[in-house]
Amino acid sequence: RDIAQGDCYLLYECGKPIATFVAKAGPEPNYHRIDNGSWLDDQPYYVIHRVASLEGVHGVMADIINYCSAFTSSIRIDTHADNRPMQASLIRLGFVYCGIIYVENGDSRLAFQRVF
């Protein structure tokens, strides 16, 4: 569905795809409720989902954020509590932990936002 809607992107290095992600304009239904915190603002934002990269490839989040910052001034993203590398990457890239959101099946995710 993300591909059909034009929201799925590939990141290339030397002509070879090394990562994929989804970036789409909010609002994100799962982000209406946030516990133990709040979003940084109520302005329009983009959401990044489903980030994946080839094994051994590092630093793609910086490239993804740089790309997305060309068309939005606010990005929201969530990640699993066990995904420590993603959390560290987000903090390093200037994201702020905002609270806990819940996905469709009720599982919790840590929510982050960066305003440029």
Predicted ranges, named:
Residues R1:
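Conserved GNAT-fold acetyl-CoA-binding loop/helix
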Residues G6-A23:
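Conserved beta-hairpin
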Residues V22-G56:
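Conserved acyl-donor/pantetheine-binding loop and adjacent beta-alpha core of acyl/acetyltransferases
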Residues I48, M86, L110-A111:
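Charge-biased, low-complexity intrinsically disordered regions
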Residues S53-A70, Q87-R92:
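Conserved acetyl-CoA-binding loop-helix of GNAT-fold acetyltransferases
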Residues A70-D82:
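Conserved GNAT acetyl-CoA-binding A-motif
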Residues A81-I100, E104:
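Conserved active-site alpha-helix within GNAT-family acetyltransferase domains
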Residues V103-F116:
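C-terminal "cap" of GNAT-fold acetyltransferases
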